[in-house]
Each structure stands twice: as C-alpha cells, then as structure tokens.
C-alpha cells in the first residue's frame, strides 16, 4: 500500500470554507491494509453531507489519499495540548462499526 499522511488529508479538508476542523485515521481494510477515514466538524450553520465532502476531497487530493468514509461530528476531539486525539477517533470508529 501507499503511505497517507493524516495531516495532508486534514489540510485538504479544512481548505473547504464550510469545514472548521478535520481529523483523519486509518481503518483496517482487507483490500488495502487501511482505508482513510475522516471526522469533520463543520462551521456553524454549514450544511454539507458526508458524500459531498468525500467527492470534494477526491477532486482535491485524488488517488488513494481521499477519505473513503467521512463522519460529520459536532467537534473533533483534542488532546490536553490541543492536538487531534487520533486514539479517541479510532475508538469512535471501532464503536460505530459494531
């Protein structure tokens, strides 16, 4: 597989004017090893759907790097030092796939 850097995908997603913050993690995949999954917090009043965000990202970063799954959330969890809490995102992903 290819290396995908979460920060690259997060930066691309947050270029969208309706996206306030994005956090990206890998989800285990039988086909590719891992799939890119994004958690996105929208700006107040924004109305974007997950499929619209996936398509927008695919047009921007394309190839294997765009997220195959997007979860629109109220807030992207942060660590006490203000970084994206990827462990919390992976936990949410596991819980949502049960």
Locate each region found by the language model.
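AMP-binding/adenylate-forming catalytic core of the ANL superfamily
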Residues: 1-65, 75, 82-91
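General small-molecule cofactor/ligand-binding pocket signal
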Residues: 70-73
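Acidic/polar alpha-helix N-cap and adjacent early helical turns
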Residues: 91-98
């Amino acid at each position: 597989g290819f290396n995908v850097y979460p920060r690259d995908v997060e930066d691309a997603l947050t270029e969208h004017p309706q996206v306030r913050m994005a956090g990206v993690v890998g989800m285990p995949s039988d086909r590719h090893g891992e799939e890119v999954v994004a958690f996105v917090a929208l700006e107040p009043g924004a109305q974007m759907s997950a499929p619209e965000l996936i398509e927008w990202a695919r047009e921007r970063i394309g190839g294997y790097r765009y997220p195959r799954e997007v979860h629109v959330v109220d807030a992207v969890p942060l660590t006490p030092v203000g970084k994206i809490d990827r462990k919390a995102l992976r936990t949410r992903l596991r819980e949502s796939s049960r």
